[in-house]
Structure formats: C-alpha cells, structure tokens
Amino acid sequence: MPKHEFSVDMTCGGCAEAVSRVLNKLGGVEFNIDLPNKKVCIESEHSSDILLATLNKTGKAVSYLGPK
C-alpha cells in the first residue's frame, strides 16, 4: 500500500487522539503519529486528497508532505 506523510499541527495527546479518531472512522488505513515532530505517516489505498480532507476534519492545520 502507498504511504503518505502529512504535517498536522498537533500540540498534545488530545490532538493526536483526534487524528486517530478521524482516520479510524475512515477505515482502510494504517498510520503512525509522530507527535513531537507533528507528522502523521499513513499507509492506505485512499488518495492523498481523501486523506487530507479526512485530517482536515480535526480542525488542525494540515499539509501534505508527499509520498514516503
């Protein structure tokens, strides 16, 4: 499965939980949250656009860093 890396403006565990919640709701994803570096690496068949839209539901500033 393709891997995508995103920058997400997470400042605490609650932010990471919000990211985890929206990704689990989307389904079909495996992900790793790097809170200190404010990055989320997602392995999924979903397009980067769908993943970006999903992460935007957290209300945090999100940007696509590219394939990993």
From Swiss-Prot:
CDD domains: HMA (cd00371). Residues 1-63 form the HMA domain. InterPro entries: Copper_transport_ATOX1-like (IPR051881), Heavy-metal-associated_CS (IPR017969), HMA_dom (IPR006121), HMA_dom_sf (IPR036163). The modification Phosphoserine is found at S47. One of its GO terms (cellular component) is cytosol. Signal peptide: none annotated. The keyword Cell inner membrane does not apply. One of its GO terms (molecular function) is ATPase binding. Cu cation binds at C12, C15. The modification N6-acetyllysine is found at K60. GO terms for biological process: copper ion export; copper ion transport; intracellular copper ion homeostasis; negative regulation of apoptotic process; response to oxidative stress. Coiled coil: none annotated. It comes from the Eukaryota. The keyword Cytoplasm does not apply. Keywords: Acetylation, Chaperone, Copper, Copper transport, Ion transport, Metal-binding, Phosphoprotein, Transport. The heavy-metal-associated domain (HMA) coordinates a Cu(+) ion via the cysteine residues within the CXXC motif. The transfer of Cu(+) ion from ATOX1 to ATP7A involves the formation of a three-coordinate Cu(+)-bridged heterodimer where the metal is shared between the two metal binding sites of ATOX1 and ATP7A. The Cu(+) ion appears to switch between two coordination modes, forming two links with one protein and one with the other. Cisplatin, a chemotherapeutic drug, can bind the CXXC motif and hinder the release of Cu(+) ion. PANTHER family: COPPER TRANSPORT PROTEIN ATOX1 (PTHR46365:SF1). Binds and deliver cytosolic copper to the copper ATPase proteins. May be important in cellular antioxidant defense. Homodimer. Interacts with ATP7B. Interacts with ATP7A. Interacts (via dimer form) with SLC31A1 (via C-terminal domain); this interaction improves ATOX1 stability and controls intracellular Cu(I) levels. Belongs to the ATX1 family. This is Copper transport protein ATOX1. It comes from Rattus norvegicus.
